[in-house]
Amino acid sequence: MISLNHYLIVAALMFVIGLVGVMKRQNLIMLFFSTEILLNAANVALVAISSFYNDIGGQIFAMFIIAIAASEMAVGLGLLILWYKKRHSIEIDSLSTMRDE
């Protein structure tokens, strides 16, 4: 039987992987993927805890997080495509030229 601790350990590992990805990556696409891993780690923890306490509130909140993450990804990738067409780079360092314009 898989206990609550197992789910929380998986969520913590996912959160650490996402956090390391956010801090170490220079590519904006990988930065978006890392934030998605962070949000999914929170979802795993919310669903596991709400299932453990037989409360549906955490699962509903996880659905809201999924919807917000999808809209964030759509807007972010749209902006990223426009930035790539203009600058031909998706590195974080290329964003510093935005304040010069």
From Swiss-Prot:
Positions of transmembrane segments: 2-22, 29-49, 63-83
EC number, UniProt record: 7.1.1.-
Superkingdom of the source species: Bacteria
Record keywords: Cell inner membrane, Cell membrane, Membrane, NAD, Quinone, Translocase, Transmembrane, Transmembrane helix, Transport, Ubiquinone
GO BP terms: ATP synthesis coupled electron transport
One GO term describing the cellular component: NADH dehydrogenase complex
The reaction(s) this protein catalyses: a quinone + NADH + 5 H(+)(in) = a quinol + NAD(+) + 4 H(+)(out)
Top EC class for this record: translocase
Localization of this protein: Cell inner membrane
UniProt topology in membrane: Multi-pass membrane protein
GO molecular function, one term: NADH:ubiquinone reductase (non-electrogenic) activity
Principal cellular location given in the protein's record: membrane
Name of a matching Pfam family: Oxidored_q2
NCBIfam families assigned: PRK05715.1-2, PRK05715.1-5
Similarity annotation: Belongs to the complex I subunit 4L family.
Summary of the function given for this chain in its UniProt record: NDH-1 shuttles electrons from NADH, via FMN and iron-sulfur (Fe-S) centers, to quinones in the respiratory chain. The immediate electron acceptor for the enzyme in this species is believed to be ubiquinone. Couples the redox reaction to proton translocation (for every two electrons transferred, four hydrogen ions are translocated across the cytoplasmic membrane), and thus conserves the redox energy in a proton gradient.
Subunit field text: NDH-1 is composed of 14 different subunits. Subunits NuoA, H, J, K, L, M, N constitute the membrane sector of the complex.
Record-given protein name: NADH-quinone oxidoreductase subunit K
Gene behind the chain: nuoK
